[in-house]
Amino acid sequence: MLKSSLLYKIINGIWDMCYIWKTEMRNVFRDEGVLIFCILVPLGYPLLYSWIYNNEVVREVDTAIVDLSHSHTSREFIRDYDASPDAKATYYCNSLDEAKQLVQKQAVHGIIYIPSDFDTKLNRGEQAHVGVYCDMSLMLTYKAIYQTAQGVASHINSGIQISKGGGFTDRDDEITTEPLAFDEVPIFNTTVGYGNAILPGVLVLILQQTMLLGIGMAAGTSRELNRNRELIPVSKHYGGIFRIVFGKAMVYFMVYAVLGMYLTLVVPKLFGFVSMVTWTTILGFLLPYILSCIFFGLMLSCLVRYRENVMLLVVFTSVPLLFMTGISWPQSNIPGFWQGFSWVFPSTFGIRGFLRISSMGASLADILPEFRALWIQTGVYFLATCLVFRQQLRSARLKANLTAEVAEEEDEAEEIVENG
C-alpha cells in the first residue's frame, strides 16, 4: 500500500490514535495523582458525602441561648425552642461573645440571640427581632436551628394575633391566625431532606470536577516530562490534531462512562435516596454531559503549566458552581450576568437535567433545553480543543527545530485525512 494513498493515511491515523489512547491510559493508572482524582475520588467521595447526609434530618442540635430580655415572652420562646425535636437549648450565655466562643469550640452549632428590648417592642405593638446565628459547615444543623426558630416565632406571632384580634370564639381565633387552611404535601422530595435535594447535583458536579482535576494534572505531568515543556510531545504518533484529541478523549470517556453510571445509579440506591432514573434516559443524558466535560477539560489543559496549578483552577470553583445551578439558591435570584457565566460550565445543565431525571422521573424530552445545551457545549468545546491542540502542536514542532515547511506539510497531510 502506497504511503501517499488516502487509505494508508486513514489507517495510520487510527493506529496513532490507538497508540495515544494506550499511552494516556497507562499514564492514568501509573500517575498516582491522576489515579486518585480520576478513580479513587469518584469512587470514595460520593460514599462519604452520602453517608453524612443519609439521615436526612438531625435531632437535638446543641444551641447557645443569649437572653438579654429576661421577660415572659423570651422565656416562652426559649421553652418552645427547647421542646422541639430538632433543636436543644444547651447553654445559656450572658453575652454574644461568650456564645461565639462555644461555636468556635464546636460545643454548639448555633446561637439564639434575644435583645434586651424584645419584650418592650412587643408591648408597644412594634416589630421585635430575634437573632439566629448558625454554623453552616453542615447544612443539616443549619436547617434544624433555622426552621425551629422560625416555627417558634410563627407560633408566638399567632398568639399575639389572637390577643389583638378581639375574637369571641375559638373559631374566630382560628380564622385570625389561619384564614386559609392548607395541607402541605411534598411531591418529589418526599422526605423534605437535604440529601434528596442536593445530593444529585453534587454527584454530577463530582464527575466534572474530578475529570478537570485529572485531565489538568495529566497535562501538567506531560509538560514536566517533555523536553520542550510543551503539552504535546514531538513524536510521529502525535502528528495530527484529530488523532490526539480522540485518543485522549477515549481514555476519559471509557473511565467516566463507568463512573457516571456508578454515581447516578448505584450510589443513590445504596443510601436509599429518591431515584426515578431509568437506564435509557441516563445513558442518553450522560453521553453529551461526559463528552462536554472531556472536551472542556482538554481545552483548559493548555492553561496548566505545573501539576499543582490545576488545584488552584478547579477546587475553589466547586461551591460557586453548585450555587449557580439554582438547586441550592433560587435561580430567579441569581443576577443575569452570573446566570450567563454559569452556561460556560457543563455542570450547570448537567445538574439541572439530572435533578429532574432523578427526583421527578423526567425523560429526555422533558429536559430538552438542558439536553440540547450539553450537545452544543460538546460541539463548541470540541472545536475549541482542536484549535488549542493545533496551536500546541505547531509550537511543539517549532521548538523542536522543525522547519515551518515541514510543519506545514504535516498539517496539509492531516487536513487531507480529516477531509477524507
Segments the model singles out, each with a brief description of its role:
Residues 44-47, 185-268:
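Hydrophobic alpha-helical transmembrane segments of multi-pass membrane transport proteins
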Residues 73-77, 148, 215, 295, ...:
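Hydrophobic alpha-helical segments typical of transmembrane helices
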Residues 38-39, 196-197, 316-317, 342:
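Hydrophobic alpha-helical transmembrane segments of integral membrane proteins
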Residues 1-196, 366, 391, 397-420:
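Extracytoplasmic/periplasmic domains immediately adjacent to an N-terminal transmembrane anchor
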Residues 14, 18-22, 196, 237-250, ...:
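Alpha-helical membrane-protein architecture signal
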Residues 28-35, 206, 247-253, 257, ...:
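Loop-to-transmembrane-helix entry motif
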Residues 37-38, 200, 246-247, 310-313, ...:
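Hydrophobic core positions of alpha-helical segments in small-molecule transporters
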Residues 48-49, 70, 91, 254, ...:
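Membrane-spanning alpha-helical segments of multipass transporters and channels
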